[in-house]
UniProtKB/Swiss-Prot annotation:
It comes from Trichomonas vaginalis. Its EC number is 3.13.2.1. GO terms for molecular function: adenosylhomocysteinase activity. It is an enzyme of class 3 (hydrolase). Substrate binds at T63, D147, E209, K239, D243. The lineage of its organism: Eukaryota, Metamonada, Parabasalia, Trichomonadida, Trichomonadidae. It holds the Pfam family AdoHcyase_NAD. Belongs to the adenosylhomocysteinase family. GO terms for biological process: one-carbon metabolic process; S-adenosylmethionine cycle. This is Adenosylhomocysteinase.
Length: 486
């Protein structure tokens, strides 16, 4: 249940407990030490404030690391409002610290409006997303920091239904989440039938954090429905090859261990999907001594897995033998309820893809005779009529954020440095970008890495002019073509 801002507060907020701000500020201060890229950007731009007055909405996990990103954007002058992009991923200490701010108190907060707490319901989640997109005077954002595309979805669907002249009845939706989306949009439509058209017209663009959200953006572009320019942060090398691999390598195990407290060594683990996230997950499980099997549809990724020493099988072939299941495909219907009915007793089932549709949790809840036995928050046992049970992590949502605290600060510093650079780019080029999805240029990728090497005591070799001429690159880079695959 959220704590709402009291009457007379300097701004609106909805968080779990504002009195958690002291611990949150301590966590934030420690995280800053591990996030050199963001701290350099603060030092570089805080005097000139290139984002002064720019309204930025965030829909991204409200963690300690995100708190450092938020305070970087505000240091650059932005007017920020924030919601989480997952009902379980908020760290309530971080949310409180951001509301209170570095110089405020619970009685007189001096931070920014946050609408997020751990354990939101779906109606609360979509209301919070709307609040993060709406300023007190009714204006919308000029720019969005998105993770998974929910903020972009709300604007795009709102625009679509305003154009059609009506919002479909929520009862027509085939799942609970979309019913909540429609209910939120219907409420807005009844108040202002042109709201989302006004918001879209004022948008400079969006920067998208994750694979699933990027897929949504490219689909909108393909259909001619992209309402504003977008920057694909996910496919920056310094995001996908670090956050997705090494972040998941760290946080997957953290989530499984905190929830289950079982010995992973010696057990059989099935990683479903061998993209960048799957690669990190497979490394982490093997590092704990698990016997790792991969499922894949892509022959290239499958061969990569085999060359790393993993077996590649179909789930149907191994479902009865696996102890730990991890989905990380970014797709839907990966583990069906019929598959869960065949799993061994007390098999652990979790997801580290962005949305909760990789595991058929709806089908699980509706299975005839199923018993739900909560173990602890975000860790539930589901017992089938035959007596065997599975252990579900975070209700099929992101287990690393639902059961733990997500990726560590250092790797998120690279992702969020990219996000900050993308926000600067959107504002600098406002009005000059097409309605398409852009990627960050290679020289910025390399610059992001350079900002982080010093803290790891890395000493780069420097090309001579002769060497640079020989391979036809500048002495200071960039060193690889856009087609190069790291």
């Amino acid at each position: 249940m959220a704590c709402k801002s009291p009457a007379g507060a300097p701004f609106e907020y909805r968080i779990a407990d504002i009195n958690l701000h002291v611990l949150g500020r301590k966590e934030l201060t420690l995280a800053e030490k591990e996030m050199p890229g963001l701290m350099v950007l603060r030092e570089r731009y805080s005097a000139s404030k290139p984002l002064k007055g720019v309204r930025i909405s965030g829909s991204l996990h409200m963690t300690v690391q995100t708190a450092v990103l938020i305070e970087t954007l505000t240091a650059l002058g932005a007017d920020v409002r924030w919601a989480s992009c997952n009902i379980f991923s908020t760290q309530d200490t971080a949310a409180a610290a951001i509301v209170v701010g570095p110089t405020g108190t619970p009685e007189k907060p001096a931070g920014i409006p946050v609408f997020a707490w751990k354990g939101e319901t779906l109606p609360e989640y979509w209301e919070n997303t709307y609040r993060a997109l709406t300023w007190p005077d009714g204006q919308g954002p000029q720019q969005v920091v998105d993770d998974g595309g929910d903020a972009t979805l709300l604007i795009s669907k709102g625009f679509e239904f305003e154009t059609a002249g009506a919002v479909p009845e929520p009862t027509e939706a085939d799942n609970l989440e979309y019913r909540c989306v429609l209910a939120t949009l219907k409420q807005v439509f009844n108040q202002d039938k042109n709201h989302w058209h006004t918001v879209a017209a004022g948008m400079n663009g969006v920067s998208e954090e994750t694979t699933t959200g990027v897929h949504r953006l490219y689909q909108l572009e393909k259909e001619g429905k992209l309402l504003f320019p977008a920057i694909n942060v996910n496919d920056a090398v310094t995001k996908s090859k670090f956050d997705n691999i090494y972040g998941c390598r760290h946080s997957l195990i953290d989530g499984i261990n905190r929830a289950s407290d079982v010995m992973i060594g010696g057990k059989t683990a099935l990683v479903m999907g061998y993209g960048d996230v799957g690669k990190g997950c497979a490394q982490s499980l093997r590092g704990q001594g698990a016997r790792v099997i991969i499922t894949e549809v892509d022959p290239i990724c499958a061969l990569q897995a085999v060359m790393e020493g993993y077996q590649v099988r179909r789930i149907e072939e191994v479902v009865k033998d696996v102890d730990i299941f991890v989905t990380c495909t970014g797709n839907c219907d990966i583990i069906s309820v019929d598959m869960m009915a065949q799993m061994k007793d007390k098999a652990i089932v979790g997801n580290i893809g962005h949305f909760d549709n990789e595991i058929d949790t709806d089908g699980l809840m509706k299975y005839p005779g199923i018993k739900h036995i909560p173990i602890k928050p975000e860790y539930d046992m589901w017992e089938f009529p035959d007596g065997h049970a599975i252990l579900l992590l975070a209700e099929g949502r992101l287990l690393n954020l639902g059961c733990a605290t997500g990726h560590p600060s250092f790797v998120m510093s690279m992702s969020f440095t990219n996000q900050t650079l993308a926000q600067l780019d959107l504002y600098e080029k406002r009005g000059n970008l097409e309605m398409k999805v852009y990627t960050l240029p290679k020289h910025l990728d390399e610059e992001v890495v350079r900002l982080h090497l010093g803290s790891l005591d890395v000493h780069l070799t420097k090309l001579t002019q002769k060497q640079a001429d020989y391979i036809n690159v500048p002495v200071e880079g960039p060193y690889k073509s856009d087609a190069y695959r790291y």
